[in-house]
Amino acid sequence: MSKTHLQHLYYVFGTDVSRFGNFIGEEVEESEDDSQHGIDADAYVYDDYPEEAPEATGQELMEIDGESLPDNGYAELTSCVDEGPSNAVILHEDKQYYPTAQQVYGVDVETMVQEEDAQPLTEPIIAPVEQKKFTIQEADLPPVFFDRSFMTDLMNFPEQIRNIAFAGHLHHGKTALMDMLVLETHDITDRLEKKTGKKRDEQLRYTDVHMLERERGLSIKSAPMSLVLQSTRGKSHLINILDTPGHVNFVDEVASSLRLVDGVVLVVDVVEGVQVNTEQIIKHAVLEGLPLTLVVNKMDRLILELKLPPTDAYFKLKHVVEEVNTVIEATLPGIGEKRRLSPEKGNVLFACSSMGWCFTLQSFAKLYSESYPGSKGNKGIDSQDLARRLWGDIFYNPRKRSFTRKPVEENAKRSFVNFVLEPIYKLYSHTISASTDELKNVLAKLGIVLKPSQYKTDAKVLLKLVCEKFFGPSNGFVDMVVEHIPSPVEAAELKLGRYYTGPMDTGVARAMHECNQDGPLVIQISKLFNTSDAAGFRSFGRVMSGTARPGTQVRVLGEGYSIDDEEDMSMATISDVWIAETRYNIPTDGVPAGNWVLLGGVDNSIVKSATLVPPVLPDKEEAYIFKPITHFTESVFKVAVEPINPSELPKMLDGLRKINKSYPLITTKVEESGEHVILGTGELYMDCVLHDLRRLYAEMEIKVSDPVTRFCETVVETSAIKCYAQTPNKKNKITMVAEPLDQGIAEDIESGKVSIKSSNRVIGKFFESNYGWDLLASRSIWAFGPDDLGPNILQDDTLPSEVSTLSSLARTPESTKRLIGPFMLTYR
């Protein structure tokens, strides 16, 4: 009650009243009549109006805190005063001290009275502006040592493009190798030191942008980078690189990445050699038909940690190379020799990514040819001839200045030890142990000049500076990639033959085969990257033909799409087109065929992978998809989840849908009991999934059950009773029997030793020679299930003499397909 209201009551009562409306003075005795009739004293508010009190005008009565209300605001009140004393009983609910909302705002205004606060106390009335950021992003485009317009021009020449992936075991140096290339092309060293305090001897880890990747020190997601690099000839190439995780739990990221590349750069730690995950990746890449190149990384560990003599270091290097070749030969017996890796072929790179150097035999031989260019009478050193003599059992005779296959003396050194390893050993030892004056003299002979302040830096920083000056840029890496990994045009035939489900004689197939940027738009999507605030996703894929431009309308064909079943299809419009650079994205007007592209606006209907095509293809051709990604592991680690607050179940379901998009091999489903189950590859994988579910996508607390292993049913003995099905017209009948496979068949199918795509003759010969099947049984295999690498076999065990009608019918492609479909669905 305001001050003005109280003042008005003073006039009405004619008695002193306190600020709370209580009487001040002697207590008035209650009359007997009033007590008997139970009349409240408040009913006489307007009675006994004192004559000596000055009459208040209507305007004064309507003044509230100095502001006037409409004249009708106190109509009832003033009328009561004008009438004088009254004996009328005014009930409490009929009293009116304030005007109604209708009287204040008018008849035409609808007013609503909220008697209870519907907003919970935990929710602020004015919520603060939240800026969520779960990944590291560059605020602006960082400066680079090449012109970005030149990079976009290179995208129009598929012959100058190479699409590769860095793959290997955990902590073998893939991300460090990427850092070396990033620092070579990006002018960010000084900026990082000023803004983050990161020293020159600390690993940059440029492609580790997820918060978990930074905390745990390992890569979880694949990270793309597009860089312009030069070869030893000075020719620029656009190298698109995917840095893949090395942990065995995250090989699903590797499989998704290999679908978009034309070759694999295998990174192996020279000390640890080929590990289990390395072996898995080699087998998968070989079975997918991808060319392999090898990077023997962390060469400095031989010098600084193991302290091996140069001769022993050579044998260690040779052993690592032969380990890789052994796995290739075991995967493809008889064909491995053609795909052999060897330094003299130029497909093996020696590197120390932490020190920022790498070389092939050809690039190291070029250092000698540049140091000894020759004169008029002296031809000088031919780098190609020298490179061919720098590996294997080839020895140098210093007396005759020639190379021999046999050692001249007992302790003769191989040419690789003499010309490659010993200079590196000496460079390391002088840089670490020599005094400043001695080091200056040694470096002066090599043509290396450093600032005086650089000699006073830490030994590790100084060693990195010296190595970068000595070896120069990574031209040897570019030479290896350009020479031994095909361009998108050269690899198109292999890609289409393995992954495209449509015919090869159509206009769309020809456009993809030629990487025609003017052809119909076809994009293969294999990965989804969440935005920095985790509110949405962007689709990452490869443009197979045409040019991806913003505003283009496309059909999004899911993994289950086919000509017969078009349910898994939706329409979308490409809102944005970027060149993906992990920490930043370069917006562009179009990305032509042969390149990788990051798209916005098409992710709503994509779960794992998809194919994007125009709404209508030229000549009204049918649209076909690329096959779903083949993974070389399974999700067998299972947990059940539920929200702590049951009302947050919709938020959890939305988070599970986003988790399903983010992780390629994650599986989410609802059991018959109603519990929500998540299936992953391992404990670390599941830990990352649950972290993202809690913090990134659902932002809620969940309860998680104890982890269990997924179990699958199998057949242990032949069916005792034949199972049959009959058509409605009773004229056709099919009978089936289940029996276990011989030991080892499932492993051979899953490893790719036998393929259902091979001819009946090849398949029959395999089962006949390896498992003793008869010729008829081995050539009667219809399908492997539930996919081409599935451990189940559908076999036609009918004899023409017994059921000639069914046998002839079953051998038609249409009827066979109708039988194979339910078989695949059953075992899925």
Language-model features: locations:
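Structural and coupling elements of P-loop NTPases
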Residues: 9-26, 30-828
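Long, acidic (E/D-rich), serine/proline-rich intrinsically disordered low-complexity regions
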Residues: 2-4, 10-11
